[in-house]
UniProtKB/Swiss-Prot annotation:
Documented EC number(s): 3.4.11.-
The family this protein is said to belong to: Belongs to the peptidase M42 family.
Ligand binding (a divalent metal cation 1): H65, D168, D221
PANTHER family per the UniProt record, alphabetical: AMINOPEPTIDASE, ENDOGLUCANASE
Active site: E198 (proton acceptor)
Cofactor(s) for this UniProt protein: a divalent metal cation
Keywords, in A-Z order: Aminopeptidase, Hydrolase, Metal-binding, Metalloprotease, Protease
Name the UniProt record assigns to this protein: Putative aminopeptidase
Stored Gene3D superfamilies: Peptidase M42, domain 2 (2.40.30.40), Zn peptidases (3.40.630.10)
Organism: Acetivibrio thermocellus (Hungateiclostridium thermocellum)
Binding sites annotated in the UniProt record for a divalent metal cation 2: D168, E199, H307
UniProt entry tagged with the keyword Signal: no
Enzyme class: hydrolase
InterPro entries: Peptidase_M42 (IPR008007), Peptidase_M42_aminopept (IPR051464), Peptidase_M42_dom2 (IPR023367)
Amino acid sequence: MEEEDMFDLLKKFTGIVGVSGNEEEIREAIIEEIKECVDEIKVDTLGNLIAVKKGKGKKIMVAAHMDEIGVMVTYIDDKGFLRFSAVGGVSRYDCIGQRVKFKNGVVGAVYYEEKLEDMKNLQLSKMYIDIGARSREEALKMVNIGDVACFVGDAVLQGDTVISKALDNRSGCAVVVKAIKELKKTDNEIYFVFTVQEEVGLRGAKTAAFSIKPDIAIAVDVTMTGDTPESHPMEVKCGGGPAIKVKDRSVICHPEVRKLLEESAKRNNIPYQLEILEAGGSDPGSIHLTAGGIPSGAISIPVRYVHSPVETASMSDINNAVKLLVEAIC
C-alpha cells in the first residue's frame, strides 16, 4: 500500500509539464496535497512555494526543486518546424526520436535535419521539433516563441522499480510531501520549500534561503548511480537506500548536517549510502553560501539515466528517503 500510494503521487507529479521558469502547475498540485497539513503557505516573488510548520525550536529549511529540464522554442520556419534551445542540462544524445509536450498539450517529435554519420557530431542546433504544422502560420496557432516543452515519459511501476521522466526532481517533491503528511509533531519550525529554477543555476533556493535564514538546511534531490554498464565508478546504487550527500561540484556538505542524517538513519535502521557526485550541483550549493552561511546537506534518491525520459529509481529508496527525512527533522 505504501508503494502504491507513493507511485500514485509520483505519477501525478511527473505527468505535469514544469520546465524551469514554468513551475505553476506543479506548484498548484503540491499545494493541493499539503494545504491541510501545514500552518502557513506562501509563494515568494520568484515562485518558490514555502510551507511552514510552526514551532519554537530550530528553524529548519527542507528544499526540493519543482522544475525539470526541457526545451524552449526559439524559431519557427516557413514550413512550421520549430527550432529550440535547451532549458537545463538536456543531453543531445537523448533528444532524437523523442516526443516533447507543451503546457497547452501540443505534442511534437524531435528529429535531425541531416543524415548523421557520427554521433560525436550531434548538435542541438541541427535538431527540430515537428508538431504536424504545414506552415509557420499554422504552427503559431499551436505554439509561440518562448514556449517550453518537456520530454514525454509516462511513469511505469515494475516491481520495486519506477521508470519515468522528471523523477529529477518530482521524486524529491513527493518525498517532502509525504514527510509533511507523516510528521505529526515537532518542536522545530520547519520551512518546506519547493524551489524553482534549480536546473538552470540553483536560483530559487538562493532567494528562499536568504529570506528564511534557517539554522540548517536539508535538500531532497536525486543523484546518479554507479550500477549500470556505462556508468562511471560510484558507490551509489539503486536499491541500496537513500544517499546522504558528502559533496558535489557545488557544495561540501556541512559535517554536522551529515552527522545528523547518518545518526538518524542508524538509529532507525534505515539503509543508506554515502554520495560523492563528481558532476553536477544541487540546491545546497546556493543555500550554504547565503545569509552569512547556512549549514547544509542533502538526502539524494539514486536515479539511473538522470536527465533522460527514462529516469529509473527504486521505490524502496524513495520510501526510505521519507523515513530518513522525518526522523532527521522531528
